């Protein structure tokens, strides 16, 4: 394809720049069919506050639709659902509330209202197109305080209990049994997971006991440090950048159909997607996920906007841009678009690896894997810490060549 780009402006003569583009005769599958498991956590509460619309109203869903569609269009797999009040305390401008109403009746029995949860999940599945996994956070919050409406006192009360305590097991066990029933009635049980993040191993062990006692078929997920003792119980385990699954464990998890990914958060100076990060780091990060043998990538926030996100991307002590990469509007960002570029490259690599292996093109496959190996902590050091922009550009050139 050939064309001309005209550059014009005040006080200078227009310039004509000829250009030529060669389009490779290949197409990618639809994003939801990509092999990469993408998990960027959504915050519906931030959208309601920013647009000043009532929570879960038509106006709220209308405001969320184009934002969430941006995620579906790049292969997002998981729906972020909060099943308790403030699962992460106040680590976002707009705290997450419980999408499930709990009431303790006068006779001591419990009833649950799933109206909001159902609306959110149905919206994300049917209108947005994200439907692989419903991640329900969390049974182990930062503050071990659990809300419910008490009919006897006609007010919201809180139970303070830690994993391993009888009150904790009663509160969660009763709920999970009813939640399992509801999910099965909706046809969502197989897609739903009880999810935790960055919690101590002993607390996780106790929570797992409660989950399995309520329904042994519940899926469980964790974003946190690798613990050999519990990894087998985790359908989906995401570990921090710089950590690796033992090879035999990763192979066994893959055989069982379990998901194993990598995540970055506010901790990693490199690679990341902060406002001040080199934009190519976003692409580098997801290429690293493939290079490291992970199934995908998780990040804890994609639209947890601070007070004035179009003017100031800082939030308290978090690095600027840590809490979002999609802006109100919705507006994309350079770092989000570079992430998309990386995701597309990951799918190209997946396709090429299969094709080259099927053809017995071992030389080309070795060349591709050698270039990809640079996108690991040790591989990057061997390149003398080459700039991410140059590394991603070189990978693009190789993919186009192949």
Regions found by a protein language model. Name each.
Residues 2-9, 15-214, 223-231, 303-308, ...:
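Aromatic-lined carbohydrate-binding surfaces of glycoside hydrolases
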Residues 10-12, 359-360:
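Short, glycine- and charge-enriched coil/turn segments that flank and shape catalytic ligand pockets
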Residues 70, 119, 123, 283-292, ...:
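Short, hydrophobic/amphipathic alpha-helical patches that form generic packing surfaces
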Residues 136, 265-266, 346:
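Generic recognition of cysteine residues
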Residues 145-148, 156, 160-226, 294, ...:
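Catalytic domains of carbohydrate-active enzymes that cleave complex glycans
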Residues 184, 202-223, 228-237, 243-259, ...:
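Eukaryote-skewed repeat-based solenoidal scaffolds used as protein-protein interaction platforms
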Residues 236-318:
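Catalytic-core region of carbohydrate-active enzymes that cleave or remodel glycosidic bonds
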């Amino acid at each position: 394809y050939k064309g001309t780009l005209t550059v014009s402006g005040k006080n200078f003569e227009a310039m004509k720049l000829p250009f030529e583009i060669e389009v490779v005769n290949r197409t990618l599958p639809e994003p939801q069919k990509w092999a990469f498991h993408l998990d960027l956590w959504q915050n519906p509460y931030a959208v309601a506050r920013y647009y000043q619309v009532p929570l879960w109203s038509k106006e709220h869903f209308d405001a969320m639709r184009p934002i969430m569609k941006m995620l579906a269009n790049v292969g997002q797999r998981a729906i972020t659902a909060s099943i308790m009040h403030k699962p992460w305390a106040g680590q976002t401008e707009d705290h997450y509330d419980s999408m499930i109403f709990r009431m303790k009746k006068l006779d001591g029995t419990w009833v649950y209202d799933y109206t909001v949860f159902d609306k959110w999940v149905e919206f994300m599945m049917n209108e947005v197109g994200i439907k692989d996994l419903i991640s329900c956070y969390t049974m182990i919050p930062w503050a071990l305080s659990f809300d419910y409406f008490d009919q006897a006192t006609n007010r919201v009360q809180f139970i303070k209990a830690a994993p391993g305590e009888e009150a904790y097991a009663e509160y969660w066990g009763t709920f999970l049994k009813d939640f399992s029933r509801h999910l099965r009635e909706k046809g969502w049980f197989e897609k739903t997971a009880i999810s935790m993040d960055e919690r101590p191993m002993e607390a996780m062990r106790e929570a797992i006991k409660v989950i399995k006692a309520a329904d042994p078929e519940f899926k469980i997920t964790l974003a946190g440090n690798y613990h050999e003792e519990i990894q087998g119980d985790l359908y989906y385990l995401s570990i921090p950048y710089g950590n690796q699954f033992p090879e035999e464990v990763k192979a066994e998890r893959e055989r069982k159909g379990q998901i194993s990914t990598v995540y970055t958060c506010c901790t990693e100076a490199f690679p990341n997607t902060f406002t001040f990060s080199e934009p190519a780091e976003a692409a580098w990060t997801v290429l690293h996920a493939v290079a490291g043998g992970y199934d995908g990538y998780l990040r804890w926030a994609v639209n947890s906007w601070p007070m004035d996100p179009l003017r100031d991307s800082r939030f308290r002590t978090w690095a600027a841009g840590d809490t979002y990469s999609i802006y109100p509007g919705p507006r994309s960002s350079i770092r989000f678009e570079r992430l998309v570029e990386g995701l597309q490259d990951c799918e190209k690599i997946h396709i090429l690896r299969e094709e080259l292996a099927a053809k017995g093109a071992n030389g080309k496959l070795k060349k591709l894997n050698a270039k990809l190996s640079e996108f690991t902590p040790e591989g990057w050091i061997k390149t003398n810490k080459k700039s991410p922009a140059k590394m991603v550009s070189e990978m693009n050139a190789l993919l186009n060549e192949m």
